[in-house]
Amino acid sequence: MPAGQHRYVAFSFTDYVADVSHNTLTYVLAARQNSSWGLGLSYLHYGDFTQRDAAGQEAGKFSAADYALSLTRATTLDHFTLGASLKLAVSAIAEYKAVALLTDVGGIFKHPGKDLTIGLAFKNIGYELRSFTGQEREPTPFDVQLGLSYKPEHMPFRFSITAHHLQQPDIVYLDTTGQARQHQSLKKSLADQIARHLVLGGELLLSKNLNLRLGYNHLRRKELRLENAPGTAGFSMGLLLRIKGFQLDYARAFYHQAGASNFFTVGTDLGRFFKKKDPASS
């Protein structure tokens, strides 16, 4: 929640490739001076599909989607903010459903004298309550992330770096079929193993109401680019715009030559619409 705002609401829409879309609604309430509560609802729709029988004959339609409801609590102590989210996640494919109970925990440190922020998060700690088949349960997508952002003094730039999947040192995937990656080296270099954990970002602060952003995801580029036409896979760009109390965020992320995804977010402080009347003025 942006500083100085007490009842913040935000809506996000992501236009992925094909018919896949992701919607998120978030509401954050400042309970006391140093704490806040948050409620979130997320819906990821994968589209509609044609169902076929064993002989390949059409047998109707089905859809697939993921849902998640989250409750978050955050508390600020001096220069540290600690928080945790409890999430109920449901995944549905046709008549099959899986349910999981998850939690995210993390902390943020803000330097008292510099524009420096460091964050650590443990995401998707939990247990699958119900599997698609009702038999063996799948592990949750656990992820440990460490992030840092820094704005040098007197410079209109902010730099950020995020390390993900720290619980798994080697996340390099090599295609050994000899078809899709005919010219790919089957040797793993230490530099590549480290780089695939990192996401780099830069932000040009043109004013308090307009920022331009650029990002690079090395893992995404290495896994999704075409060898003969890598293009802009792994790169992203966007902007932040503030207009009359509303904050608009837009980003375009390039995954593959086949297309890119668009991310839209609009947020505002509801308190500005329900300001209490000053008794002295009546």
Residues covered by each model-derived region:
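Subset of outer-membrane beta-barrel
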Residues: 1-282
